[in-house]
Regions:
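Short beta-strand edge/turn micro-motifs at domain boundaries
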Residues: 106-127
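Surface-exposed, charged secondary-structure patches
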Residues: 67-107
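Short, low-complexity N-terminal intrinsically disordered segments enriched in polar/charged residues
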Residues: 1-34
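Beta-strand-connecting loop/turn residues
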Residues: 1, 89, 119-120
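Short solvent-exposed beta->alpha transition segments
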Residues: 49-78
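Internal alpha/beta loop-helix hairpins
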Residues: 24, 29-57
């Protein structure tokens, strides 16, 4: 099956690799795409694992998973990347995630901040 992150790759060749081993994620954009796919699959464990410990919403995990299951994920558009390459330790990715909730088309438009620590990328927060 095609990867839900809209990379045009197969899931097994894309976000499944990250979902299996987060250390395989090489860029901030790849982590952001893998997190989008984790929302599509309501993979709360990965969403928590890929969220930086300083901002990780552990107490909201059940609600996040419940919400992720309740919407129909339609599309991810990556708009802009700043740094976040394999050689970097920080970066930002601006994106739009389009989904349908209660019959209405909705959109999350965010510029996300990422940090790489000990070779592993993490989502920190929205700027």
């Amino acid at each position: 099956m095609k990867c839900p992150c809209c990379s045009e790759k197969l899931y097994k060749d894309c976000c499944e690799i990250a979902h299996t081993d987060i250390m395989q994620v090489k860029t901030a954009e790849a982590l952001m795409r893998s997190r989008y796919s984790a929302f599509v699959f309501a993979n709360g464990d990965y969403l928590m694992q890929s969220h930086h410990k300083s901002t990780r919403p552990i107490k909201e995990k059940k609600e996040i998973v419940k919400w992720a299951k309740s919407v129909d994920w339609i599309k991810l558009d990556v708009i802009k990347r700043t740094k976040g390459l394999e050689k970097d330790t920080e970066g930002t990715v601006e994106f739009k995630a389009i989904f349908q909730e209660d019959g209405e088309l909705q959109m999350i438009h965010e510029n996300s901040r990422f940090l790489k620590e000990n070779g592993c990328w993490f989502y920190v927060d929205a700027l």
